[in-house]
Amino acid sequence: MNKDQIEGEWKNIKGIVKEKWGKLTDNDLTEINGQREQMLGKLQSLYGYSKEQAEKEWKDFQDKHR
């Protein structure tokens, strides 16, 4: 999925995102709203990922859910 697809399909994939990253709350997911930078920031703060690791995790997720 590309950026536009993620943002457009956010309501449909929120559950999949929450399954993978269970520390994300419903409020977090609403705040993120499919926006890449918001997602990366949450992964960094909740999981202690470096920026590079968060980017890799998010890219891997997108590639898996095309």
Curated annotation (Swiss-Prot):
This is UPF0337 protein pc0632. It comes from the Bacteria. Belongs to the UPF0337 (CsbD) family. The lineage of its organism: Bacteria, Pseudomonadati, Chlamydiota, Chlamydiia, Parachlamydiales. It comes from Protochlamydia amoebophila (strain UWE25). Pfam families: CsbD. InterPro entries: CsbD, UPF0337_stress_rsp, YjbJ, YjbJ_sf. Gene3D superfamilies: YjbJ.
